[in-house]
C-alpha cells in the first residue's frame, strides 16, 4: 500500500515520470499535461465521484485523442465504506429529499462496486481512488514468487514454517 499511502507526495515515492502518483501535471509525449486528481480536493460524495467519472472521460493519449477511459472500481478506506455503499448501492440519490434516480447506480458507472482498503494510514483515512480500465496503468511485479518451507523436530513434535516473497 506504499504507493497509495504516498500518492500525493513524491518525497518517498514517485511514479515513472518523476511526479507523485496523484499529480496535476503528469507530462505526456505530445499532448498537454495530464491531471489525475480533482481540480478541487473533495471528500467522497456523490458530486465528487460524478466529477471524477467526467474527468476520466476527458483523458487523452499522447496524440491528444480521447482514450475512452472508464471507471471499474472505487477503492476506499474503512472511514468511507458506508459513504461508498450509500453512493453506489441505493436506488435513489443519496442524501437528498429528491426522488431522483441514483445515476451512478442506474448507469452501472462503477461496475465492480467498491472495495475497502484496510491498509491506508491514519493520514489517508478520507482518501478514495477510482480504478480504471486504462491499459498499461500501474504495474505490479512479483520479483520472487512465494517460497515456503517447513522444519519438523522429531523429539518435540514442533514444526516451524516459513514463507518468503518479494514485489515491486
Identify the residue ranges that each predicted region occupies.
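Sequence/fold signature of self-assembling virion shell proteins
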Residues: 18-58, 68-73, 79-168
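Arginine/glycine-rich "motif VI" loop of SF2 helicases in the C-terminal RecA-like domain
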Residues: 65
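Conserved helix-loop functional segments at active or binding sites
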Residues: 6, 58, 62
Amino acid at each position: 500500500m506504499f504507493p497509495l499511502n504516498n500518492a500525493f507526495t513524491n518525497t518517498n515515492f514517485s511514479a515513472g515520470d518523476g511526479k507523485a502518483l496523484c499529480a496535476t501535471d503528469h507530462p505526456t509525449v505530445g499532448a498537454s499535461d495530464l491531471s489525475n486528481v480533482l481540480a478541487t480536493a473533495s471528500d467522497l460524495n456523490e458530486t465528487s465521484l460524478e466529477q471524477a467519472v467526467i474527468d476520466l472521460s476527458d483523458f487523452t493519449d499522447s496524440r491528444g485523442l480521447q482514450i475512452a477511459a472508464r471507471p471499474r472500481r472505487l477503492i476506499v478506506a474503512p472511514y468511507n465504506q458506508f459513504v461508498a455503499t450509500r453512493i453506489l448501492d441505493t436506488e435513489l440519490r443519496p442524501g437528498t429529499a429528491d426522488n431522483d434516480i441514483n445515476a451512478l447506480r442506474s448507469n452501472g458507472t462503477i461496475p465492480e462496486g467498491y472495495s475497502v482498503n484496510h491498509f491506508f494510514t491514519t493520514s489517508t483515512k478520507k482518501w478514495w481512488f477510482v480504478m480504471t480500465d486504462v491499459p498499461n496503468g500501474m504495474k505490479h511485479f512479483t520479483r520472487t514468487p512465494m517460497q515456503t518451507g517447513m522444519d519438523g523436530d522429531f523429539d518435540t513434535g514442533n514444526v516451524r514454517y516459513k514463507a518468503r516473497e518479494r514485489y515491486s
